Amino acid sequence: MKASMFLALAGLALLFVVCYASESEEKEFSNELLSSVLAVDDNSKGEERECLGFGKGCNPSNDQCCKSSNLVCSRKHRWCKYEIGK
């Protein structure tokens, strides 16, 4: 009876260690994945766009909206919108 209790407790302890180790690996993987995503995001911040995209805030006196996409800076709303009719 004592031997079976000892084996059961040893089995539970082993199961705990295995589960804890696999959970630690999962956390490390998710942390690495998150770090790589944030690193890619930081790299893209360094690259300034030459023009502003749709819905981006702008200044009508200094229109920096993308002309190639038919965007203009709205004087009323102060954001880049599509110019219709041209």
Swiss-Prot record:
Q: Which GO terms describe its cellular component?
A: extracellular region; host cell presynaptic membrane
> What role does this protein play?
Neurotoxin that selectively inhibits neuronal tetrodotoxin-sensitive voltage-gated sodium channels (Nav) (IC(50)=44.6 nM). It is active on Nav1.2/SCN2A (IC(50)=22.4 nM), Nav1.6/SCN8A (IC(50)=50.1 nM) and Nav1.7/SCN9A (IC(50)=48.9 nM). It shows low affinity for lipid bilayers.
Q: Record's Pfam families?
A: Toxin_12
Propeptide ranges, please?
22-49
Molecular function GO labels: ion channel inhibitor activity; sodium channel regulator activity; toxin activity
Family of the protein in this entry: Belongs to the neurotoxin 10 (Hwtx-1) family. 22 (Htx-4) subfamily.
The modified positions for Isoleucine amide read I84
Q: How does it assemble?
A: Monomer.
Name where it's found: Secreted
The principal localisation class reads secreted
Q: Is Disulfide bond one of the keywords UniProt gives this record?
A: yes
For this UniProt record, the keywords arranged alphabetically read as follows: Amidation, Disulfide bond, Ion channel impairing toxin, Knottin, Neurotoxin, Presynaptic neurotoxin, Secreted, Signal, Toxin, Voltage-gated sodium channel impairing toxin
Q: Which InterPro entries match?
A: Huwentoxin-1 (IPR011696), Huwentoxin_CS1 (IPR013140)
- Tissue and organ distribution: Expressed by the venom gland.
Q: What else is known?
A: Negative results: does not affect tetrodotoxin-resistant voltage-gated sodium channels or calcium channels.
Give all cystine bridges in this chain.
Answer: C51-C66, C58-C73, C65-C80
Q: How are the domains described in the entry?
A: The presence of a 'disulfide through disulfide knot' structurally defines this protein as a knottin.
Does the entry feature the keyword Coiled coil, yes or no?
no
Signal sequence region: 1-21
Annotated protein name in UniProt = Mu-theraphotoxin-Hhn1b 1
Interacts with channel, annotated site positions: K76, R78
